[in-house]
């Protein structure tokens, strides 16, 4: 019965509800006459926080019986798939595609034994390995879910999810040097993402306008509806203001600004990825510095490009709270500094990122893996750079659970 389901999940329900969903649910329950106007206004008026409103709401709905509770469950499943996954709900009270996070026994039994990752030994990554990703053992998966079940992004069932990743790599340019070694990075990142369960789209040698077009098309892919996350990888020359397109020159800039990437994948423009982690990897310089044997992914900083105005920053800050969420960007260097690439071994940053993802995805969340990558750069040498995470709006830990 639906009322029994809500009783069992009451605590997690209260802890997990978001402001947008609680307001929509109140409207739905008013429209379907589960609540009258006075009851709805009382929930809003007498409770200051979302948790208090949720507690008052569920305690009002459960006594009204199974039909009222079923209306509540159906609304959540149809309007907030992330919350439904967190609660282990579906319209018929099954767990659906998401792994149930409500109680540890349900979670642990839902994990199948990890399946072998298929690799091609003839295709080495930039680190020189065979591209093997360590699988997450059943015991390790159980341990993580048991300890952090309410703080982890839910993952969809491996047999039915449709994870997508996009790689955009510019190697050839009209007016600036070729990025020798970029093919090594493409091969390594493609294998890594495939081994983590993503179907990978690779696009090469694009203008800023072409990159925008590809991003828009990617954001509208229907597969995102049945996916739990996405990765986007950009590898090109770069300057402080963004990523260089193939036609870039100091005289005629051809730049994809980082803000455009976030905007095209936010909740407004890509609702299918709402409440799902979106990881952006950027291998590009963000300033200028001389190099000798090693090449640097950098061109001269153009004075023709304007930075966002103060008004734009203020507007963006408001939007972030409502539209931009569940992002993390990992850049190969801090602002104004260079990123290094070897002509035969590929980029230093991409190589170390692949190594660390292969080694630690089985036991660490993405933010912790990125910290380990930064730690590997802690002692500077003649090719010093320091990767940095930016615009992090992940609200939960993103574990990849390779093999599951």
Swiss-Prot record:
There is a cross-link at residue 134 (Glycyl lysine isopeptide (Lys-Gly) (interchain with G-Cter in ubiquitin)). The active site is at residues 237, 285. Its EC number is 3.4.22.36. Expressed in larger amounts in spleen and lung. Detected in liver, heart, small intestine, colon, thymus, prostate, skeletal muscle, peripheral blood leukocytes, kidney and testis. No expression in the brain. The keyword Translocase does not apply. (Microbial infection) Specifically inhibited by the cowpox virus Crma protein. PROSITE patterns: CARD, CASPASE_CYS, CASPASE_HIS, CASPASE_P10, CASPASE_P20. Its main location: cytoplasm. The modification Phosphoserine is found at residue 302. One of its GO terms (molecular function) is cytokine binding. The two subunits are derived from the precursor sequence by an autocatalytic mechanism. Transmembrane segments: none annotated. Pfam families: CARD, Peptidase_C14. Keywords: Apoptosis, Cell membrane, Cytoplasm, Hydrolase, Isopeptide bond, Membrane, Phosphoprotein, Protease, Thiol protease, Ubl conjugation, Zymogen. Induction: Transcription and translation induced by M.tuberculosis and a number of different M.tuberculosis components; EsxA is the most potent activator tested (at protein level). Changing residue 297 to N: In IDL(uncl); abolished cleavage in the interdomain region. It is found in: Cytoplasm; Cell membrane. Residues 1-119, 298-316 form a propeptide. Changing residue 318 to N: Mediates autoprocessing but is unable to interact with Gasdermin-D (GSDMD) and mediate its cleavage. It comes from the Eukaryota. Thiol protease involved in a variety of inflammatory processes by proteolytically cleaving other proteins, such as the precursors of the inflammatory cytokines interleukin-1 beta (IL1B) and interleukin 18 (IL18) as well as the pyroptosis inducer Gasdermin-D (GSDMD), into active mature peptides. PANTHER family: CASPASE RECRUITMENT DOMAIN-CONTAINING PROTEIN 18, CASPASE-1. This is Caspase-1. It comes from Homo sapiens. The lineage of its organism: Eukaryota, Metazoa, Chordata, Craniata, Vertebrata. The gene is CASP1.
